[in-house]
């Protein structure tokens, strides 16, 4: 990671054959720390989660932004607009989430054990500066179940059989943002590109659902 930052800060110091990347990093670091030397580019970085910006998928990526140092530009990354805390409160404190999806109290699942303490904390708070994370249910609940309804006229919304859960690949819960979706050679691939229903059963996301997510 540090090597990438140094390379972006000093792109003029390229690697010299047969120099290894470790040797190149050492030379970049020495150049960077020399007081008489100034970075060619000012580089800022931050780890961002797509779910924090309204995407119904937890997808974390590191973003690098660089400007020529002589421009004096100061970059600020955007602040999150959505949060897990607001989602938990929406689901387990106010219940507005279930009301929006017209799910009666008897049909609502129990709060996961891992969020019990968080729910208790959020119950004391009345104001949030962010919107709840968008969930899989938020994104695809208006689409018919492709396993039971096959004549719907929606493009790329066909059931793909064969989904199964195994350690490390359990699918995306309906009432959370989807796990990171991955591309594959056969439409929507397996692994984490599955929906896990409240009863524990799984099925593959259709291509249309994956596009929504």
Identify the residue ranges that each predicted region occupies.
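Internal, well-ordered alpha-helical scaffold/interface segments
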Residues: 138-141, 179, 211
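Low-complexity, glycine/alanine/valine/leucine- and proline-rich hydrophobic stretches
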Residues: 195-213
């Amino acid at each position: 990671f540090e090597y990438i930052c140094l390379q972006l800060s000093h792109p003029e110091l390229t690697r010299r054959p047969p120099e290894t990347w470790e040797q190149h990093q050492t030379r970049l670091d020495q150049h960077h720390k020399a007081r008489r030397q100034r970075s060619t580019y000012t580089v800022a970085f931050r780890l961002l989660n797509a779910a924090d910006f309204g995407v119904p998928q937890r997808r974390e990526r590191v973003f690098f932004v660089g400007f020529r140092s002589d421009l004096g530009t100061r970059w600020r990354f955007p602040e999150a607009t959505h949060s897990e805390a607001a989602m938990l409160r929406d689901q387990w404190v106010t219940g507005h989430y279930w009301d929006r999806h017209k799910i009666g109290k008897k049909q609502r699942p129990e709060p996961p054990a891992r969020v019990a303490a968080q729910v208790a904390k959020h119950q004391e708070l009345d104001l949030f500066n962010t919107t709840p994370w968008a969930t899989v249910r938020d994104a695809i609940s208006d689409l018919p179940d492709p396993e039971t309804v096959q004549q719907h006229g929606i493009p790329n919304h066909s059931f793909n059989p064969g989904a199964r859960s195994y350690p490390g690949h359990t699918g995306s819960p309906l009432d959370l943002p989807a796990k990171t979706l991955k591309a594959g050679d056969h439409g929507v691939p397996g692994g984490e590109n599955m929906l896990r229903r409240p009863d524990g059963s799984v099925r593959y996301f259709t291509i249309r659902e994956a596009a929504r997510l």
